[in-house]
Amino acid sequence: MSEGGGQVSCIFAAPTRLCRWPALIECGVNLTQPLCEWMIQVARDRTLSLAWEVASLLTLSSSEVGLEGVGTIWPSSYSSEESSRNGAEQGRQLSIEGPFQGQNCPSHPAAALPLPMRGESQATSCQV
């Protein structure tokens, strides 16, 4: 195969190792800048394609994945009556749709929840 002046003399078995020297030596690749840019673009396109596949799975309802009757749990912000009076604490609760509709998860004081580490989201656990 010839692409932009570069030549690939074999089939890559590990595409994630394309830009590492061991893979280049094993596969005998003569890379030029256009070929490298083309490979990066192909990798980007594949990554975006996979991201869209995952995103579409996340938007499925419980009935579409065979979990009828389980219901859907949505996070929602709230401020308890006591917190509203003193303005000190704010927490989160879960609003529940489905067979558990009308039941709320127990609220936790904000101080009792561990602070999320950088890059993590804070989750509220609930057992109904």
Curated annotation (Swiss-Prot):
It is found in: Cytoplasm; Nucleus. Keywords: Cytoplasm, Nucleus. One of its GO terms (biological process) is positive regulation of mRNA splicing, via spliceosome. Highest expression in placenta, muscle, fetal brain, and adult brain, with lower expression in heart, kidney, stomach, testis, and adrenal gland. In the central nervous system, highest expression is in temporal lobe, hypothalamus, medulla and spinal cord, with lower expression in other brain regions. GO terms for cellular component: cytoplasm; cytosol; Golgi apparatus; nucleoplasm; nucleus; perinuclear region of cytoplasm. Residues 77-128 are annotated as: Disordered. The keyword Membrane does not apply. It comes from the Eukaryota. The keyword DNA damage does not apply. Interacts with PRDX6. Was called 'saitohin' in honor of the late Tsuanao Saitoh and his laboratory. This is Saitohin. It comes from Homo sapiens (Human). The lineage of its organism: Eukaryota, Metazoa, Chordata, Craniata, Vertebrata. The gene is STH.
